[in-house]
């Protein structure tokens, strides 16, 4: 998402920026609260326009079959709990993008759980134990410290 922050408040400036690809336009002065609210809205919108659904995703030795809700590592089916699968599937559908803790918690557990980062960390640890050859050095899900997680695709995938 692109949010333009500008001192220019003329309509033609706003129209030019929005027509040029900006998702929002905010004119100075503005409060930090308004800016963060607009960032949250832009992020929600960007996640709603998720990439087209593909029936399967394969990277390295990991295969996720979204239609069958199955996960395989090196051809072996891995049993995930329903919540673990939802976390993995959401991250995989947004591969390469940083998904914040709050976004992931709201999507999987609901808005009331947006601050339950400990719950998310516990589930992420369980997912890594099941998927990763070396859970301490993950290949598939990278922690973006203080922000969230990113699902990684191997080069050429």
Regions found by a protein language model. Give the residues of each.
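C-terminal end segment of the histidine kinase catalytic
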Residues: 50, 153-157
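DNA-recognition element of transcription regulators
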Residues: 31-44, 79-89, 101, 114-134, ...
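Flexible coil/turn residues that form the inter-helical turn or adjacent wing/linker of helix-turn-helix
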Residues: 28, 97, 113
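Basic, amphipathic DNA-recognition helix from helix-turn-helix-like DNA-binding domains
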Residues: 1-58
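Short, Lys/Arg-enriched segments at the junction into DNA-binding effector domains
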Residues: 41-98, 102
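Short coil-to-helix segment of the ABC ATPase nucleotide-binding domain corresponding to the Q-loop/switch region
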Residues: 33, 97-108
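Short helix-capping/turn signature of helix-turn-helix
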Residues: 93-95, 111, 147
């Amino acid at each position: 998402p692109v949010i333009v922050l500008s001192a220019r408040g003329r309509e033609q400036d706003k129209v030019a920026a929005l027509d040029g690809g900006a998702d929002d336009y905010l004119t100075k002065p503005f409060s930090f609260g308004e800016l963060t609210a607009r960032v949250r809205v832009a992020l929600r919108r960007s996640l709603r326009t998720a990439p087209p659904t593909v029936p399967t995703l394969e990277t390295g030795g990991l295969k996720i079959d979204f239609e069958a809700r199955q996960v395989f590592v090196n051809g072996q089916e891995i049993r995930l709990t329903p919540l673990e699968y939802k976390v993995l599937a959401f991250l995989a559908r947004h591969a390469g993008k940083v998904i914040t803790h709050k976004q992931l918690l709201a999507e999987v557990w609901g808005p009331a759980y947006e601050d339950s980062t400990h719950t998310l960390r516990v589930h992420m640890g369980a997912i890594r134990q099941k998927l990763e050859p070396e859970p301490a050095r993950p290949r598939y899900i990278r922690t973006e410290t203080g922000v969230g997680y990113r699902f990684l695709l191997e080069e050429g995938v």
